Amino acid sequence: MESTLGLEIIEVVEQAAIASAKWMGMGEKDTADQVAVEAMRERMNQIHMRGRIVIGEGERDDAPMLYIGEEVGICTREDAKAYCNPDELIEIDIAVDPCEGTNLVANGQPGSMAVLAISEKGGLFHAPDYYMKKLAAPPAAKGKVDIRKSATENIKILSECLNRSPEELVIIVMDRPRHKDLIKEIRATGARVRLISDGDVSAAICAAFAGTNIHALMGIGAAPEGVISAAAMRCLGGHFQGQLIYDPADVNTPESADWNREENIKRLKSMGVEDPDKVYEAEELASGETVLFAACGITPGTLMEGVRLFHGGARTQSLVISSQSMTARFVDTIHMWDNPQNIQL
């Protein structure tokens, strides 16, 4: 899979990032997202594969493109037999977020990127559109920290694993009212908190790389993005756990005010989630034999530069990670269109 699709998926996220970057700082988050969706879908449909969106822009009735269940790739066309040999057909599941951090793009803030994860059919967890409690940490802490433990306990373990004092640790938390007590607890240990408005996939990945000065991600975010984060962390050997959140009291958002705890439990069970309280490991959320993850910076971030547009072209920086070869490749690309001038270095 890596040898046949590795370069292709880089180009998919590059095209989505470039399209979205053209709307950076324009205050139009929906447009920045929509153009990324269109560009990602168009490039996917040029790939020799039979792909199925398992995490995308929403249910079919709510999303015209890259909706859950949509099939993409040349081998999904009606005339597929003319292009695809059934014996060589690659059937894959795909999780996408064409513009992770739409508000970041709209406001010209750092940390947004186009991301996707792929695996063979059945290799990615079909996360319901709920919230998820998440814990991401470096490979050195894998299997030692635990989402069921308190933040205080996990920071103590993390400190020991990384041979750092708590004061030398930085924990990423989404800047949400629901995290008020979590932030207070983290700070009480001496660890420092970096608040982010959006983009917890990027934050989770940063925790796996030494030198980012990010040592863990804690708190509650969207479940679909949790699967994408898990795919990346599985490839990197980092620690990731997720637990679905169904109680409105844990989320504390305007939309959760209409939630009913018992109804949410029933809905999750109807979707195949036998134990709504189950803690999922990265290897369960991304269970495929082969998992590939790709991301391209839209605005500048800790790991990657954002898209840099110049007359007649653009320069992008991407990351592709593979569980097959256990590699993380940073790809710096100059895209030259019509009569490029002043090529960006």
Curated annotation (Swiss-Prot):
GO molecular function: fructose 1,6-bisphosphate 1-phosphatase activity; metal ion binding; sedoheptulose-bisphosphatase activity
Annotated positions binding Mn(2+) 2: 97, 100, 225
Protein name per UniProt: D-fructose 1,6-bisphosphatase class 2/sedoheptulose 1,7-bisphosphatase
The protein's role, per its UniProt record: Catalyzes the hydrolysis of fructose 1,6-bisphosphate (Fru 1,6-P2) and sedoheptulose 1,7-bisphosphate (Sed 1,7-P2) to fructose 6-phosphate and sedoheptulose 7-phosphate, respectively.
Group of enzyme by EC: hydrolase
Family: Belongs to the FBPase class 2 family.
Pathway: Carbohydrate biosynthesis; Calvin cycle
Catalytic activity: beta-D-fructose 1,6-bisphosphate + H2O = beta-D-fructose 6-phosphate + phosphate; D-sedoheptulose 1,7-bisphosphate + H2O = D-sedoheptulose 7-phosphate + phosphate
Naturally occurring in which organism (per UniProt): Picosynechococcus sp. (strain ATCC 27264 / PCC 7002 / PR-6) (Agmenellum quadruplicatum)
Cofactors (names): Mn(2+)
Subunit structure of this chain's protein: Homotetramer.
Gene3D superfamilies reported for this sequence: 3.40.190.90, Fructose-1,6-Bisphosphatase, subunit A, domain 1 (3.30.540.10)
Pfam families the record matches: FBPase_glpX (PF03320)
Keyword entries, A-Z: Calvin cycle, Carbohydrate metabolism, Hydrolase, Manganese, Metal-binding
Gene Ontology terms describing biological process: fructose 1,6-bisphosphate metabolic process; gluconeogenesis; glycerol metabolic process; reductive pentose-phosphate cycle
Annotated binding of Mn(2+) 1, by residue: 33, 57
Listed NCBIfam families: glpX
EC number in record: 3.1.3.11, 3.1.3.37
GO cellular component: cytosol
Binding residues for substrate: 100-102, 131, 176-178, 198-200
